[in-house]
């Protein structure tokens, strides 16, 4: 069977004789070098992209897409009205009020400084992924308890490990918002019962955050209404545009921030690392490609007499 002319010519010059074996070896090594370099580049880019997406999903899952504050002394004292206004903004799908403060959590064996987050359990579960992150217990247990029973507290698994506590154990929270006494300002203290443990996949979050009901946090931290409102939008990447539209529609008395603003330094560092890896591996591919060019030049020079 006769081979096609093009295939015959290709095989003739690819299958080198003994004196051409060195050139063919260089070609093979260079080709393999390019293949390995490209493979390493694709794997590195895939890993960095996957890391960025996973980190983004975990960060956004632990909080809302947009935060809204109201400037002034009254702030969000009547947050129910603000919730309804914000729900009317295009592309906003969910809204939840939040109170945030610092406290000292103590048990019989340990203590830790925590960030206390007051929430409406039903609304918060719609805005963030806290509901699906519960590993033991339930977020619904934060509902108002009966007379004489302790209020519920949901904490991260990392924080539970630091305190040596489990679901059902009692924890005392102390806040600096206390009352004046002859001894000075006495911290406000209140006992809680752990009703749930969560794991958001973020070490800092899981080791320092605790959730209580909004009205409980207001009394404990001496707040009125809510500190800010978390919003969820229909498209994660539309959050910056929606935040700008909220400021335009509601006026300059409102301050907004989206998830990308709050984590800009982190994602910028990841982007720079991704670019550095791409450039480094790209140079490796370039060196291998130059070897291929060199081997082809040698091959052409060797075969120049055979070219009519």
Q: Language-model features: where?
A:
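Hydrophobic C-terminal alpha-helix "anchor/cap" residues
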Residues: 14, 59, 85-90, 246
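Alpha-helical membrane-protein architecture signal
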Residues: 3, 7, 11, 259-263, ...
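Mechanotransmission and gating elements of multispan inner-membrane complexes involved in transport
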Residues: 177-178, 185-277
């Amino acid at each position: 069977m006769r081979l096609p002319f093009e295939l015959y010519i290709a095989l003739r010059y690819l299958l080198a004789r003994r004196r051409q074996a060195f050139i063919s070896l260089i070609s093979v090594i260079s080709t393999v070098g390019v293949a390995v370099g490209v493979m390493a580049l694709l794997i590195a880019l895939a890993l960095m992209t996957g890391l960025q997406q996973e980190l983004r999903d975990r960060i956004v899952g632990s909080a809302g897409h947009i935060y809204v504050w109201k400037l002034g002394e009254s702030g969000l004292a009547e947050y129910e009205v603000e919730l309804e206004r914000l729900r009317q903004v295009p592309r906003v799908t969910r809204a939840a009020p939040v109170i945030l403060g610092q406290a000292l959590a103590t048990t019989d064996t340990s203590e830790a400084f925590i960030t206390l987050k007051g929430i409406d359990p039903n609304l918060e579960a719609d805005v963030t992924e806290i509901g699906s992150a519960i590993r033991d217990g339930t977020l619904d247990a934060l509902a108002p308890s009966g007379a004489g029973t302790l209020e519920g507290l949901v904490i991260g698994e990392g924080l539970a490990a630091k305190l040596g506590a489990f679901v059902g154990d009692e924890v005392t929270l102390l806040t600096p918002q206390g009352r004046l006494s002859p001894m000075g300002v006495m911290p406000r203290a209140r006992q809680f019962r752990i009703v749930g443990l969560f794991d958001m996949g973020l070490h800092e979050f899981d080791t320092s955050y605790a959730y209580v009901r909004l009205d409980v946090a207001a009394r404990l931290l001496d707040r009125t209404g809510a500190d800010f409102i978390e919003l969820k939008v229909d498209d994660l990447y539309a959050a910056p545009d929606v935040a700008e539209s909220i400021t335009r529609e509601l006026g300059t008395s409102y301050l907004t921030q989206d998830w990308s603003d709050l984590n800009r330094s982190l994602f910028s560092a990841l982007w720079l690392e991704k670019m550095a890896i791409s450039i480094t591996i790209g140079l490796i591919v370039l060196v291998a490609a130059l070897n291929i060019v060199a081997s082809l030049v040698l091959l052409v020079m060797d075969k120049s007499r055979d070219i009519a």
